[in-house]
């Protein structure tokens, strides 16, 4: 009988979480949702010195922002130590593990001898019990590590959903340390016990874990467990072709939020960073879940492309509700010194957002563009000298007069602009540029008629007339 699908995301809280990390949450989340299964969050925090609550919080915050909800967890490995110790005791009792007293110095010396002889460096089984074998006398006062009694013959085989059939000879594997001298279990051991206890059916993770897989399968089988389906995802590369990492300049997941990216854009981009559905580039979260499968996971490293993410973000910004974007823009406006009081004195923020969003790739850019509506203009003196010339002043005066009398609609403002151009035999930039400078303080705005309508008649006319006084 087919087991109900259960997937997991099992990060180590030892640093910030970047897009390459969170992709290993997105795919198992999507697969669990597609298969009506269960998605488990497990925090692998056995590296006590490097783990931190701050890193855990960053993981949870990033998952929440991207909408990667989990059904069980977070489950912390440090809270399962009693269970690990019980399994270690069981393995010792059943002869599946044994104490090893070889010191680190002895092991280093052994490996040096093996290298000198052209052999693969590995533990040689000195303390491994065998029928008829006489073991050395345990040294006084030395606490042993525990090693897993790996099979000496045969082959570990699994059909990886990404890499295809993988075969590793047990002769290549030495007896893995599964507990330290102080009794604390090792990562590879904890992972096996967790996956077994949590009935994980599919392990979707980075291919930096491939070398761990045959050892984990052997331990799992020794404990009577059924190996899950493995899907080892190729590395995510940065734009320079290096493995994505903090050291190589990767941004944290939340840095994308703080830069003005929308979560749906990041999810869409991440989904395509190692998986495909035909030629589809833009799709909703619901479509992604419906389409996701393991068969179309990429087999080659995926390279991050910031311009592609920005393009997707621009698409989702255009599609987003103005009120939602306005709320998201508020922190960016605050950072620009534009508070609620300033916004209250200007045009409706939703309307400003609606005008500015078609030109923006991030919410931050929307806020930067919207700021002109809530500030007293301070145009550059050189720009004023260039655009507000004696030749154009009569046209500006006529335009101000026309705008005083016009209906305050985009169409009426546009008609006033065109009539002024015709009267003074000017081209649009000759009039629009000085008007932009005087009203908005910049020559870079959306369509001039739409901008003037939002500024309002009083602000537009008074600012033009003040410059002509």
Swiss-Prot record:
Catalysed transformations (reactions): tRNA(Glu) + L-glutamate + ATP = L-glutamyl-tRNA(Glu) + AMP + diphosphate
Q: What is its EC number?
A: 6.1.1.17
Enzyme class at the top of the EC tree: ligase
Specify which residues bind ATP according to the UniProt entry for this protein: 246
The GO annotation for biological process reads:
glutamyl-tRNA aminoacylation
The record ties this protein, via CDD domains, to: GluRS_core
Q: Name one GO cellular component term.
A: cytosol
The cross-references to InterPro entries, in alphabetical order and at most eight, read:
aa-tRNA-synth_I_cd-bd (IPR045462), aa-tRNA-synth_I_codon-bd_sub2 (IPR020751), aa-tRNA-synth_I_CS (IPR001412), aa_tRNA-synth_I_cd-bd_sf (IPR008925), Glu-tRNA-ligase_bac/mito (IPR004527), Glu-tRNA-synth_I_codon-bd_sub1 (IPR020752), Glu/Gln-tRNA-synth (IPR000924), Glu/Gln-tRNA-synth_Ib_cat-dom (IPR020058)
Q: Where is the composition biased (Basic and acidic residues)?
A: 118-131
A molecular function annotated in GO for this UniProt entry is: ATP binding
Q: Where is this motif: 'KMSKS' region?
A: 243-247
The cellular location(s) given in this protein's UniProt record come to: Cytoplasm
Q: Where is this motif: 'HIGH' region?
A: 11-21
Instruction: Using the UniProt record, give the first listed, main subcellular location.
Output: cytoplasm
Looking at the record, which segments are called Disordered? 118-138
Q: Which UniProt keywords apply?
A: Aminoacyl-tRNA synthetase, ATP-binding, Cytoplasm, Ligase, Nucleotide-binding, Protein biosynthesis
Q: Which domain of life is it from?
A: Bacteria
Q: How does it assemble?
A: Monomer.
Task: Report the sequence similarity comment from the record.
Answer: Belongs to the class-I aminoacyl-tRNA synthetase family. Glutamate--tRNA ligase type 1 subfamily.
Q: What does this protein do?
A: Catalyzes the attachment of glutamate to tRNA(Glu) in a two-step reaction: glutamate is first activated by ATP to form Glu-AMP and then transferred to the acceptor end of tRNA(Glu).
Q: Which NCBIfam families match?
A: gltX_bact
For this entry, the protein name equals Glutamate--tRNA ligase
Please tell me the species this chain comes from.
Answer: Burkholderia vietnamiensis (strain G4 / LMG 22486) (Burkholderia cepacia (strain R1808))
Q: Which gene underlies this protein? A: gltX
């Amino acid at each position: 009988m087919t087991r109900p699908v259960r997937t997991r995301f099992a990060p180590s809280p030892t640093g910030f979480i970047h897009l390459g990390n969170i992709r290993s949450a997105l795919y198992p989340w999507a697969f669990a949702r597609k298969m009506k299964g269960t998605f488990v969050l497990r925090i692998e925090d056995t590296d006590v010195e490097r783990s931190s609550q701050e890193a855990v919080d960053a993981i949870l915050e990033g998952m929440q922002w991207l909408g990667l909800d989990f059904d069980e967890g977070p489950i912390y490995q440090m809270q399962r130590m009693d269970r690990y110790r019980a399994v270690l005791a069981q393995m010792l009792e059943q002869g599946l593990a044994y104490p090893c007293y070889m010191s680190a110095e002895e092991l280093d010396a052994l490996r040096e001898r093996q290298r000198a002889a052209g052999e693969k460096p590995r533990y040689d089984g000195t303390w491994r019990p065998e029928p008829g074998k006489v073991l050395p006398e345990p040294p006084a006062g030395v606490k042993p590590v525990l090693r897993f009694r790996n099979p000496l013959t045969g082959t570990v085989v699994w059909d990886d959903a990404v890499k295809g059939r993988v075969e590793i000879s047990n002769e290549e594997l030495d007896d893995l340390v599964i507990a330290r001298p102080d009794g604390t279990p090792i990562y590879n051991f904890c992972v096996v016990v967790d996956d077994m206890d949590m009935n994980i059916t599919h392990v979707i993770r980075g291919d930096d874990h491939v070398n761990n897989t045959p050892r984990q399968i052997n331990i799992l089988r020794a404990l009577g467990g059924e190996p899950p389906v493995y899907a080892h995802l190729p590395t995510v590369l940065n734009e320079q072709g290096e493995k994505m990492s903090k050291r190589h300049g990767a941004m944290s997941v939340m840095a994308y939020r703080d830069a003005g990216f929308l979560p749906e854009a990041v999810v869409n981009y991440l989904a395509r960073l190692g998986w495909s559905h035909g030629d589809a580039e833009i799709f909703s979260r619901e479509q992604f879940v419906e389409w996701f499968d393991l068969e179309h996971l990429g087999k080659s490293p995926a390279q991050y492309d910031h311009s592609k993410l920005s393009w997707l973000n621009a698409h989702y910004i255009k599609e987003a509700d103005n009120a939602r974007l306005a709320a998201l823009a508020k922190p960016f406006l605050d950072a620009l010194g534009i508070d609620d009081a300033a916004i209250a004195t200007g045009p409706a923020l939703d309307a400003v957002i609606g005008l500015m969003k078609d030109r923006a790739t991030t919410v931050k850019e929307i806020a930067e563009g919207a700021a002109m509506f809530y500030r007293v203009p301070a145009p550059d003196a050189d720009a004023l000298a260039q655009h507000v010339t004696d030749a154009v002043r009569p046209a500006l005066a006529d335009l101000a007069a026309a705008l005083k009398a016009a209906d305050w609609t985009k169409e009426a403002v546009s008609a006033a602009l065109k009539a002024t151009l015709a009267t003074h035999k000017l081209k649009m930039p000759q009039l629009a540029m000085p008007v932009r400078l005087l009203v908005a303080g910049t020559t870079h705005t959306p369509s001039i008629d739409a901008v003037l309508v939002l500024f309002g008649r009083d602000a537009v006319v008074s600012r033009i007339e003040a410059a002509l006084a």
